[in-house]
């Protein structure tokens, strides 16, 4: 009997350890939503390649504007995106976080004041997160957090938005915060916000910026990576284009990534994995690198 008890306890400890490892291990993060031909959200999650999927984008908001979600060819958020609710739940039931990205490389967005930031935070909470609203474009699904992909403006008030969103972590569902800065440090738009220490994940865009991206040599990228690991964030991710067509420059062939870059950056205590832009361009890249991430 004693031997059986020990065996059971040993098996339980192994399961707990495995759960801990899977919940704290590295992952591939993917942006989804900007191409109607990239497949469904459920299929994206069911691929088994991604640990987090980011819905892109709420590209209009702030400064008196009515916030607007743009999911390109997938659906019209004003009328028929409720069908995504079941897909979101499918992802979450598989242990995959689903975040909503605000901003993007195009669109009209800005924050004019702290009050504006607080108002927008309440809107995000009530419309997409754990709050309540008569209008929820994605139905009753509760997203896991908000991603800041801010690529224009002077950087003011994004720290206030982060504080306001974090303020909703009041014992209810956790609101994860992520940021996608450009690789030159400091980032003109997001460094002040990241300095609050409120961000769980920072996936740095190591592309479209030759001084800090891969270009036959990994030296510039690795130097920039080392600088980014000093910022106040729980985890830092290597942000890359998923193909040569996904960005103007900075694509790293899978064999170069796995031999020249990942072995070094995985030694960083804050290493979280790889972020890819985007699902529409990921025609096998994530599968090729998954085992090395």
Curated annotation (Swiss-Prot):
The entry's keywords: Carbohydrate metabolism, Chitin degradation, Disulfide bond, Glycosidase, Hydrolase, Polysaccharide degradation, Secreted, Signal
PROSITE patterns from the UniProt entry: GH18_1, GH18_2
Any one Gene Ontology BP term: polysaccharide catabolic process
Highest taxon, organism lineage: Eukaryota
Keyword Hydrolase: yes
Reactions catalysed, as given in the entry: Random endo-hydrolysis of N-acetyl-beta-D-glucosaminide (1->4)-beta-linkages in chitin and chitodextrins
Any single Pfam family the record assigns to this protein: Glyco_hydro_18
GO cellular component, one term: extracellular region
Chief location bin: secreted
Domain GH18: 26-293
Enzyme Commission numbers on file: 3.2.1.14
Signal peptide limits: 1-25
Top-level enzyme category: hydrolase
Expressing tissues: Accumulates in leaves during infection.
Cystines in this chain: 45-91, 75-81, 183-212
Induction record: By fungal infection.
Homology family: Belongs to the glycosyl hydrolase 18 family. Chitinase class II subfamily.
Protein's UniProt name: Acidic endochitinase SE2
Primary gene name: SE2
